[in-house]
């Protein structure tokens, strides 16, 4: 037997072999010399570059375990792991069955080994490098070998060999098309436990970008902002809705209260004497023109309960109450029942004032065509609408201004004193006139014209007593005043005293004046200016270029001018072209040099005394009509003359006053420019008459613009000779002073004073050189000076543009030349030649003191006119007045009128040649009068 020691030498031999292997292994595992420092820095930078960021991308590995049960069912368990994508492979998702591979198994290059089917995920656990000092393949080579065998992805456990990460990253230049993932730490332990214990497991690799910490921050801010804004809007809407509901409830309560305060009446068609809205109405309403309900369009039945709104409109109570509760306004006029201010008795007071105001009527003087230049501002006053006793709407003014109280008496109403007066020019002197005129008979049936016209869509009617001042203020005229009793020396001589003079300098005004829309020029249309008065209740728009713009209820008709041409057409008596105070400003004919006549209808001018009164020639008319309430025609001192005589008071029983208007238009259709001074109103007016009633009288007066003339006998005053004014032309239209008729004797003692003509024209514009046509004896003289159009006047204006200023005559003392009973304001001076329904008469004595010469001679165009004495002039003018009286008297026999007409043309021819001498005589006197006048 061998001893045991014999075995020990063998054990010693094995140790020796191990020792020998270690040095050999150590010799094989010697590392190459370390690379230089710049190379290491480059590698670090490369690792810190995009590759490092790419290597940090996370790979989510989801391992699904399948456990089979005895019944054949499978139970799945999912385990989530986290790894990193290596730069050696692609960064994408992959899925497949897990197959564990040994590192040495990947080194086998035997082609006989079975290849796995495509779609598996290989899991390789790397060992320590010391255990494999001489590996057959690198880690990257092993990954390539696995992909070649059909692996969709390769997962390396680098927990024991961290250097493998760097080896994998070295293959970034030629990466694989399949993902290469490495895991370590706890995730690697979980993965290896699953691989070692489970036979069937499936891995799903997903690539997810790293979540940003502010990924949903913007969305959160937006949602928060949206929620806040929504809440704010919701709160505001709720508040607004609640406020509207409270306001609606309040308005409904106010409407109910207003409805409770409104009166209800029972309709009674049998009661004819009681009017709607009258103060005496108790519990019934009378029938009127509106006997049907405007809502249901059914007629009122006796005993039906009607609701009367504060605007005096009435409806069925059952029809209007729901509307009023919902809309709070009148269905007819939109009157707000909640905002109604004032007491219920205001309508009654207004109705009573209106009924009293209707008793006083006035016809405005003639308006001459031209362009108006207003010298003061025109503010607008608020108005409100009410109803008169006839059911017609009237507009009332609301005045808050306070004018110069010193100009009005204590008895003057407050609404009159609230208007500032307009200071007028006192530039015209007076003259003597001994003519007597007849009083005007108040008996005249007024008719209401139908509304017609295309100049304005809705008539602006003002028929209340107070509304006349809007007309005056809009036109820039003076304002009225009511005075006390007149002096006893001016007692009325006629049936009644219409204008008792006053010595306190009061102002003139009409009682009722309507205001129409402002004038404007349109092609083929007319101006819609109309001065309408109390005896009418509807404003009229009219066409001045047609044979009658509206239909009328009147059966009588006459002839009137409806165009600027010489044609004469039939017009009804109450045509809108001839309403009292209406005026036409339309320039229809392009060929005619002058505008048409002012359209005025007939008005009765009946004499109250058979033989002692007369009517003046044709010209501007002052027509007064009305009823007994007396008013005063005050007088204002004029600086144009140094002496005066008492004026007689008119014998008309009317309580009307004189008024004037200013209107605005283009004199010619082709005018476009105009030069005006700051405070001047200039005009040139051509009057054109129809040749149907009298011979075509043509007379051109030459002279200074301050030469006055008589409104009755149509004679200008004499003027001293003087040099001509040169190229600066002046033209003046004169109307005599206001006329009175009193009870004093015909030869009463004169009083100092002077008067101013009613119309004054300023010489700022170049006048026209055409003559002025007159029909009969005009009451207004138109004086013009023929000058060169390119003269040195310096006005720089166009000759087609003219202006006119229609003003009041304000005098403090009666003018000279008119004895008591000499004139009558109620006399109407016809403008239209065919409107001769007045009993015209001329005085037996005409005491004009003029130096324009006789009317009876003829002279050549170059024959000088001698200056005649005062006595000879008076005799010739007296004869001239008698001839004119015979010519204009409607009842004149044909043979007598023919005899007069036979002698009359010679006088007219004579007067046409009398321009130069009168102009030279009026020059110095005009300048002296201007220097002595203090101005307006």
Swiss-Prot record:
Signal peptide (from-to): 1-55
Enzyme Commission (EC) number: 2.3.2.27
Cited Pfam families: zf-RING_2, ZNRF_3_ecto
SMART domains xrefs: RING (SM00184)
Keyword field contains Glycosyltransferase: no
Keywords: Cell membrane, Developmental protein, Membrane, Metal-binding, Signal, Transferase, Transmembrane, Transmembrane helix, Ubl conjugation pathway, Wnt signaling pathway, Zinc, Zinc-finger
Protein name: E3 ubiquitin-protein ligase ZNRF3
Name of the gene this protein is made from: ZNRF3
